């Protein structure tokens, strides 16, 4: 036992010869000092040559890949960033020195002038001021001054463009203006006196009279219908004594009819194309001799003719229009005649002096209709530019600009009360204007098609008559402007209308070649 244990012990303590062999240490390799090597290389002068040759050898061997477009200029990149930082620093410095208004509305106006949005989402007044300051620090404060200067210049040029120009008239125009002033002032005094007397009538009496009038108007019926021509009838006008009716036709003929039996009295031949209007002299059939000038008419070829009651041929021609004359109207005195022309002007003719005394521009398109104030002091014109103008004949100035219609104005008329004006337009509406307030006081949605004419009741202006291309004429209360009666019966467009001087008859003429008389039952 002992011997075996001893042998095992001996076995554990002994090891093979190859396991106990000593480890051989490798010798250290010394490459020398880098500093010494560099010093030696510089001493030999081989730095540039060796560097270039080594780089060239590496590129040829394919170990170094360098293309010409991948060169990165470190110094230039750093200088650009430095310039940007300096520019931003200078901008912030300028921004701190810029004074911006604390009024938010003014800040918004400045932003709008610079073409910037006046507000951003979630932006308050303080942020808006800071944004304006930053914008001004970039574009400069002179940009805002230049913008304001340009706005003022454009506004000034726009005002100059909208300025009303006047033709230099002859000395006879000055004489006519003085004559019109002397004529109109007494008539205005008389009208105001009548208005005061009417005001003294008890309210109950006036209300009762108005109710009776409305009842009579609601009972209007077609009293007479007459075929007037082979072509459409464009215009109709009652004589001052309400005993005759003049009609103008597209055939070039003008006809005079007796009222109320509608029998043909005269056929006036002289025009060669569509006749636009024919009107009686204010004193015709009242105090004017039949041999004198009793009517005036105009046509699409620019001709204007004067007629007497005892001849079928024109008494005289008024020359001077080169384009279409749409309407002609007598001044209340009967001395002057107004014509509207498609050359964007209207003209006033003195028939006693037999000359044109006024050639008035002011519309941007053709002038279609004209009306005179019953005092004789004012003239109103409506144009195809959708604007109307009121002119003072005593001074020549445009005293009121009628702006509001969306399309052409085809009819204009003064109320006998002296301060209301009605205009009818291609936008299917009739607007009522007040000379005292210098604005539109009511818009009547009158018809379903363009309005061709408007007419106030000639005595007191107690109602308004309108006609349109929807084949109807309508009567409206004044004041109130509520519908009273629709005059339906024409099979075509209503092209003209009129009210007799006594207010008892209404005439309408149509594209269906007929004219109709309407009378209360």
From Swiss-Prot:
Pfam families: PRP4, WD40. Its main location: nucleus. GO terms for biological process: mRNA splicing, via spliceosome. It comes from the Eukaryota. The keyword ATP-binding does not apply. InterPro entries: G-protein_beta_WD-40_rep, PRP4-like, PRP4-like_sf, WD40/YVTN_repeat-like_dom_sf, WD40_repeat_CS, WD40_repeat_dom_sf, WD40_rpt. Keywords: Acetylation, mRNA processing, mRNA splicing, Nucleus, Repeat, Spliceosome, WD repeat. One of its GO terms (cellular component) is spliceosomal snRNP complex. Plays a role in pre-mRNA splicing as component of the U4/U6-U5 tri-snRNP complex that is involved in spliceosome assembly, and as component of the precatalytic spliceosome (spliceosome B complex). Component of the precatalytic spliceosome (spliceosome B complex). Component of the U4/U6-U5 tri-snRNP complex, a building block of the precatalytic spliceosome (spliceosome B complex). The U4/U6-U5 tri-snRNP complex is composed of the U4, U6 and U5 snRNAs and at least PRPF3, PRPF4, PRPF6, PRPF8, PRPF31, SNRNP200, TXNL4A, SNRNP40, SNRPB, SNRPD1, SNRPD2, SNRPD3, SNRPE, SNRPF, SNRPG, DDX23, CD2BP2, PPIH, SNU13, EFTUD2, SART1 and USP39, plus LSM2, LSM3, LSM4, LSM5, LSM6, LSM7 and LSM8. Interacts directly with PRPF18, PPIH and PRPF3. This is U4/U6 small nuclear ribonucleoprotein Prp4. It comes from Mus musculus (Mouse).
């Amino acid at each position: 036992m002992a011997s075996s244990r001893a042998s095992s012990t001996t076995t554990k303590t002994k090891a093979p010869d190859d396991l106990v062999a000593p480890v051989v240490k490798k010798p250290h390799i010394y490459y020398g000092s880098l500093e010494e090597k560099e010093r030696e290389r510089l001493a030999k002068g081989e730095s540039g040559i060796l560097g270039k040759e080594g780089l060239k050898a590496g590129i040829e061997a394919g170990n170094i890949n360098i293309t010409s477009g991948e060169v990165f200029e470190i110094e230039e990149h750093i200088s650009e960033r430095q310039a940007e930082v300096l520019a931003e620093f200078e901008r912030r410095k300028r921004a701190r020195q810029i004074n911006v208004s604390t009024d938010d509305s003014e800040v918004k106006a400045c932003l709008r002038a610079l073409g910037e949005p006046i507000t951003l989402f979630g932006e308050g007044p303080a942020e808006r001021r800071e944004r304006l300051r930053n914008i001004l620090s970039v574009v400069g404060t002179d940009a805002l001054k230049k913008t304001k200067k340009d706005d003022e210049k454009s506004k000034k040029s726009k005002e100059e463009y909208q300025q009303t120009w006047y033709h230099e008239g002859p000395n006879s125009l000055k004489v006519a203006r003085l004559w019109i002033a002397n004529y109109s002032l007494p008539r205005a005094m008389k009208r105001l006196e009548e208005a005061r007397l009417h005001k003294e009538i008890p309210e109950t009496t006036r209300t009762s009279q108005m109710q009776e009038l409305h009842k009579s108007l609601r009972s209007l019926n077609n009293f007479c219908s007459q075929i007037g021509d082979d072509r459409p009838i464009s215009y109709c006008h009652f004589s001052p004594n309400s005993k005759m009716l003049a009609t103008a036709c597209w055939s070039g003929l003008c006809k005079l009819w007796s009222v109320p039996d509608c029998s043909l009295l005269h056929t006036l031949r002289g025009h060669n194309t569509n006749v636009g209007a024919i009107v009686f002299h204010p004193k015709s059939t009242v105090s004017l001799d039949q041999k004198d000038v009793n009517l005036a008419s105009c046509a699409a070829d620019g001709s204007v003719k004067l007629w007497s009651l005892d001849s079928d041929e024109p008494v005289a021609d008024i020359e001077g229009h080169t384009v279409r004359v749409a309407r002609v109207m007598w001044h209340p005195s009967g001395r002057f005649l107004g014509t509207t022309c498609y050359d964007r002007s209207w003209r006033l003719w003195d028939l006693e002096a037999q000359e044109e005394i006024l050639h008035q521009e002011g519309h941007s398109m053709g002038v279609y209709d004209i009306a005179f104030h019953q005092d004789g002091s004012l003239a109103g014109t409506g144009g195809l530019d959708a604007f109307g103008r009121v002119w003072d004949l005593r001074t020549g100035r445009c005293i009121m600009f009628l702006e509001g219609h969306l399309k052409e104005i085809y009819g204009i008329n003064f109320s006998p009360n002296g301060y209301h004006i009605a205009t009818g337009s291609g936008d299917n509406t009739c607007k009522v204007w007040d000379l005292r307030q210098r604005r539109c006081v009511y818009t009547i949605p009158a018809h379903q098609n363009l309005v061709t004419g408007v007419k106030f009741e000639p005595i007191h202006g107690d109602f308004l008559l309108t006609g349109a291309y929807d084949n109807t004429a309508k009567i409206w209360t004044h004041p109130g402007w509520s519908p009273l009666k629709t005059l339906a019966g024409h099979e075509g467009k209503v092209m003209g209308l009129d009210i007799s001087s006594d207010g008892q008859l209404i005439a309408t003429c149509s594209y269906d070649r007929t004219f109709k008389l309407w009378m209360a039952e």
